[in-house]
């Protein structure tokens, strides 16, 4: 337990060092946001149920929380209530009264985070409390008591409203068995998913109901279309066999760079930030690099959060529509029984690639915010010993993230390419949200 706590605190310390913020500074409102996000990134790695869809959902609601906290007192930003599915009736600031954004944000995030990470354990809860205490002392220093009380109360009421909204999205309450539904009856046939490891809990796939959750920005998940998978066949002349053989052949002849990028984008739960957290990490690096103001910060985090949350709903909708077997299963059955992928195959169906859908959604949002040819360096994996990678654009980063699943032996090409296109469609709905008055 203490080891986990130290890892969380270390993650927060690494974030603070990279951002140039220390607790000796008086934080700006955007510093408050990014500091809490830094802690959340650490917690995603160490909270048992935080699989990729669950993490994406949390980042979605987190982004809406910080956005609405700022929009409620902004002359330029307008609320997302009425634009996001089911979001309405948010509390308002009292007209003519003085509020402080830093106090509101800290109170909202200190209320939101322990609810979404309540099963992170005593160490994680201790990290929340420590950060809340430190930031609270900083943001209220020298402030009139009535402003502190009013701002704190508003932040807490806003967080309560967002949490109430989140409870109606279909994701359910506590996730049992880490999300592996032991009651699920698996379809039977040569084309269907079967377990890819020997872990008892993972003999059933992850979160089979997730694709039915309420979306954020896209009205209905079927509003974006994707091609069905290639017709299943065991014939060596078939397209399906050729795509499986490609995974096999590529995996047997990986270059050093292909191996490196497969590991860079692996984004495994319990070890990394997950795909959505990786996308958020990229955004945070750029927000710091650009010294983004408060309104830009919350706009980017809200759009990206809801885009990636919707992307995971869409990917899981596709996965459990087709229940397609993984490449490792097909290859070991028909090509080489001793073959294994570079990366551990996740315990859920192949089609579509969740990484690809997420990456596509991220690229659309970030390209709208920063342009088609925004070059950047991604240092997300640096704390894990992974060298930074540089990209000429967000689309290039998304393409590499998607392709990494071929090099890792995780997905067929069709799941990757169609997933990327599908994710870009989903991301467009978040990109089209009206945030400026």
Regions found by a protein language model. Name each.
Residues 1, 19, 282:
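Regulatory/sensor and coupling segments of signal-transduction and defense proteins
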């Amino acid at each position: 337990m203490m080891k986990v706590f130290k890892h969380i605190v270390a993650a927060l310390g690494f974030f603070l060092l990279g951002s140039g913020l220390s607790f000796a500074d008086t934080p700006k409102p955007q510093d408050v946001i990014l500091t809490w996000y830094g802690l959340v990134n650490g917690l995603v790695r160490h909270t048992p149920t935080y699989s990729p869809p669950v993490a994406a959902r949390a980042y979605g609601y987190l982004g809406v929380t910080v956005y609405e906290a700022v929009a409620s007192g902004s002359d330029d930003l307008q609320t997302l209530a009425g634009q996001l599915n089911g979001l309405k009736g948010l509390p308002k600031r009292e007209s003519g009264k003085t509020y402080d954004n830093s106090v509101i944000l800290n109170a909202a995030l200190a209320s939101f985070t322990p609810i979404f990470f309540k099963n992170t354990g005593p160490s994680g809860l201790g990290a929340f409390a420590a950060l809340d205490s430190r930031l609270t002392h900083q943001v209220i220093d020298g402030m009139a008591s009535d402003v502190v009380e009013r701002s704190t109360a508003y932040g807490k009421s806003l967080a309560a409203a967002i949490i109430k909204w989140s409870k109606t999205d279909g994701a359910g309450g506590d996730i049992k068995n880490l999300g592996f539904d032991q009651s699920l009856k698996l379809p039977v046939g040569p084309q269907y998913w079967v377990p890819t490891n020997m872990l008892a809990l993972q003999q059933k796939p992850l979160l089979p109901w997730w694709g039915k959750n309420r979306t954020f920005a896209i009205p209905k998940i079927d509003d974006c279309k994707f091609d069905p998978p290639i017709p299943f066949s065991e014939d060596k002349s078939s397209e399906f066999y050729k795509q499986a053989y490609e995974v096999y052949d590529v995996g047997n002849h990986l270059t050093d760079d292909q191996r490196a990028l497969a590991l860079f984008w692996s984004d495994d739960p319990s070890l990394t930030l997950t795909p959505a957290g990786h996308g958020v990490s990229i955004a945070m690096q750029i927000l710091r690099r650009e010294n983004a103001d408060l309104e830009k910060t919350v706009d980017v985090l809200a759009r990206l959060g809801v885009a990636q949350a919707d992307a995971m709903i869409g990917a899981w909708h596709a996965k459990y529509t087709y229940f397609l077997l993984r490449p490792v299963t097909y290859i070991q059955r028909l090509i080489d029984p001793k073959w294994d992928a570079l990366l551990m195959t996740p315990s859920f169906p192949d089609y579509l690639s969740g990484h690809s859908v997420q990456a596509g959604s991220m690229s659309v949002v970030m390209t709208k915010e920063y342009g088609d040819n925004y070059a950047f360096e991604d240092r997300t994996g640096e704390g894990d010993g992974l060298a930074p990678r540089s990209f000429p654009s967000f689309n290039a980063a998304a393409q590499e993230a998607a392709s990494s699943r071929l090099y890792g032996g995780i997905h067929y090409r069709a799941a990757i390419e169609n997933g990327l296109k599908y994710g870009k469609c989903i991301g467009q709905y978040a990109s089209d949200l009206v945030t400026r008055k």
